[in-house]
Amino acid sequence: MSDVKKAVLAYSGGLDTSVILKWLQDTYQCEVVTFTADLGQGEELEPARQKALKFGIKPDNIFIDDLREEFVRDFVFPMFRCNTVYEGEYLLGTSIARPLIAKRQIEIARATGADAVSHGATGKGNDQVRFELGYYALMPGVKVIAPWREWDLLSREKLLAYAEKHGIPIEMKHKQGGSPYSMDANLLHISFEGRHLENPAAEAEESMWRWTVSPEAAPDAAEYLDLEFERGDLVAINGTRMKAHELLAKLNELGGKHGIGRLDLVENRYVGMKSRGCYETPGGTILLRAHRAIESVTLDREVAHLKDDLMPRYASLIYNGYWWSPERRALQALIDNTQESVNGWVRVKLYKGNVIVTGRDSKTDSLFDPTIATFEDDQGAYNQKDAHGFIRLNALRMRIAANAQTKRG
């Protein structure tokens, strides 16, 4: 293989990346650095360190980093400033995590003198694109090793056989032959793919869901939350200020209890195929609804409509892996500028899978003027006669077109 001296592997400690670790050592005969990111996935990460040590990885070459605050503060919250949704439904929980992982991998590569990076994404999915676009944007000359595009371990059986041959621990769920869901989790969401979900007509099993109760099993009593925003970002829940990752974790807890945030969809992958996935995004679902509500009283109409026009493009950039692109950065600068006035509070009611906005206001930036909007006597604040000329001017082009149509017969 090509001359690789040291490679930084995005390492979860699971079967796939453990096989990759051994394969890198055998195939490239290079030194391997492992990097495990804590993005709030709720798993114990120390076992990844112990597994890496068993593969002969030097202690100084094992990185387990708590990235929860950076993830929410610098990636999730900026994305939600745009009310970002891909294809009308998906809140991009997996997509938004990949640029941070790529960033940290490159930082570690520079710090350790590595000349290569590696990941465990398959050649069929979006993640290979997301990781590698990030690598090249941040370290143009880096060597990228994508084992799923190189090796011949193209079935679960071959992967298990390789693991057994090389003494790689195999979790009981794999030994029992049941093909588990392919899952990805972080503070924003948990996703499920595979098994019977590959039939888009089949309903997901209730036992699959991890973070949320079913709406039918949710409490019969609604729960109200007051959410405070500053410059478009959530800063407090019910008057209690917390760090960004703590806020999202709290919303996940509250939303999950009320059956909020389940999603079952078929999406268009960047590589060209359609795939079916199920997602739980309780906190993100609450955050999206509340953010739109505070914008409704603080954003100028045309600015709000411009954001809505740009959002699908922004969402596609994130979904397709272009977080580090100049066009995403340019859009972010515009979006962030619009958020200077997005300050205030929103009250939501959580009830059996629903997020219902019941109030919103801003003491400093509200554009809602009750003296003009009232249905009662406005004491001359708005002259209704002004509407006559406004309507006639806006109808002019349609009147001209209608007259022309009449002449044509």
Curated annotation (Swiss-Prot):
Q: Which GO terms describe its biological process?
A: argininosuccinate metabolic process; L-arginine biosynthetic process; urea cycle
Q: Which domain of life is it from?
A: Bacteria
GO terms assigned for molecular function? argininosuccinate synthase activity; ATP binding
Which positions bind L-aspartate?
Answer: 122, 126-127
The keyword Metal-binding is assigned to this record: no
PROSITE patterns (UniProt xref): ARGININOSUCCIN_SYN_1, ARGININOSUCCIN_SYN_2
The entry's protein name is: Argininosuccinate synthase
- Family of this protein: Belongs to the argininosuccinate synthase family. Type 1 subfamily.
This protein's UniProt keywords: Amino-acid biosynthesis, Arginine biosynthesis, ATP-binding, Cytoplasm, Ligase, Nucleotide-binding
